[in-house]
A protein has these predicted regions:
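N-terminal amphipathic/basic leader segments beginning at the initiator methionine
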Residues: 1-34
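Mg2+-dependent prenyl diphosphate-binding active-site environment of isoprenoid biosynthetic enzymes
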Residues: 11, 26, 32-262, 329
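Short, charged, amphipathic alpha-helical segments
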Residues: 14, 18, 206, 299, ...
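Residues at alpha-helix boundaries and the short loops/turns that link adjacent helices
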Residues: 52, 56, 135-138, 154, ...
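A short structural micro-motif
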Residues: 67, 150-151, 211, 273, ...
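Short, contiguous acidic/charged loop-to-helix segments that flank catalytic cores in large enzymes
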Residues: 235-237, 295, 315
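Mobile late-domain/C-terminal helix-loop "cap" segments
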Residues: 261-312
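Short, amphipathic C-terminal "tail helix"
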Residues: 304, 310, 317-336
Length: 336
């Protein structure tokens, strides 16, 4: 049994293990190649987060989904590079919008070089992803364009907030489907599609990816509250400080409205105050970590991960399917 990737994914098949490891190594080379520029400063900025590491969750899904067809097909590694470049580009932009100063345990690009360079570097990565996509054919371009549209729509919905009368939790889950589920779903879709898997298999894996992506982001929401920076590589409570609603906070507000408990209302008022104040921020984190809303968010994460597992039911039993099931379990384990 060998662990592959940061999730401690146990691969019990030597051929699968070798395929995944070789594929991930090729993706790493592809990422470094795709982020090179004739201008050294652009190379430095574009490779900043590549070299900082990361989970490479999306390329891993491409490699596993490719096991259901010709796992040596030439489009697999480039498509994995595309989804990771797209993901990295969104991180540059997210950190500007969130005013985050730490990403993957290093200074964020905006903290190091300013907002303009960070935004333009994200744009550069999108451009490089498009260049690779052009060689993968019109269907790949269309699939990526649809996912990118959903991703941006999710970001806009998050910024705009729920419309009057809309349940905030439902709105938030829709946001996550766009912001995170779309690209994770495309990772699975590309792996299956590029390997020439049957359309039914492509659809099943896409549904799995969509649900897993939401579970993955919900786990991140929990980690943002529950972990320290050593565990997550990010500043704890970044979303909290910026007033960005995440599921633990939404579950708290839901409970406060339903039960009217004084301590819940007081915590909501604290969250509505200026959390750029370090003492207030630390107190809000402490109270949320001990609040039932955090456990409710963990249960929500488990539910989405279980939905992802259920989506795999039509697939034949094989080591790749087992690995995908284990991956959904690993996502839940991250949330504690």
């Amino acid at each position: 049994v060998t662990d592959v990737g940061p999730f401690g994914l146990s691969v019990r098949d030597q051929a699968l293990e070798a395929d995944v490891q070789a594929g991930m190594a090729a993706v790493e080379e592809g990422l470094l190649e795709a982020t090179k520029s004739e201008v050294p400063f652009i190379t430095e900025a574009a490779q900043h987060l590549v070299r900082a590491g990361g989970k490479r969750f999306r390329p891993l899904l491409v490699m596993l989904a490719a096991q259901f067809g010709d796992r040596y097909a030439p489009g697999i590694v480039p498509s994995a590079v595309v989804v990771e470049l797209t993901h990295l580009a969104t991180l540059y932009h997210d950190d500007v919008m969130d005013e985050a100063t730490v990403r993957r345990g290093v200074a964020s690009a905006n903290a190091r070089w300013g907002n303009s360079v960070a935004v333009l570097t994200g744009d550069f990565l999108f451009a490089r992803a498009s260049h690779i996509l052009a060689d993968l054919g019109p269907e790949a371009v269309r699939v990526q364009a649809e996912a990118f549209e959903r991703l941006v729509t999710g970001q806009i919905l998050e910024t705009a907030g729920p419309q009057d009368g809309r349940d905030p939790v439902e709105h938030y889950l829709d946001v996550l489907g766009g912001k995170t589920g779309s690209l994770v779903a495309v990772s699975c879709r590309f792996g299956a599609m590029m390997s020439g898997a049957d359309d039914t298999v492509v659809d099943v894996l896409t549904q799995y990816g969509e649900r897993l992506g939401v579970a993955f982001q919900l786990a991140d929401d929990v980690l943002d509250i529950a972990s320290d920076s050593h565990e997550s590589g990010k500043t704890p409570g970044t979303d909290l400080r910026e007033g960005i609603p995440t599921l633990p906070v939404l579950r708290l507000r839901e409970r406060a409205a339903r039960l009217g408990l004084a301590e819940d209302i007081a915590l909501c008022e604290l969250l509505d105050s200026d959390l750029t104040d370090d003492d207030r921020h630390a107190e809000a984190l402490r109270l949320l970590r001990a609040h039932p809303a955090l456990e409710q968010a963990r249960r929500d994460t488990v539910r989405y991960a279980q939905d992802a597992r259920s989506a795999l039911a039509p697939l034949p039993d094989c080591t790749a399917k087992t690995a995908l099931v284990e991956l959904s379990d690993a996502v839940v384990h991250r949330a504690g």
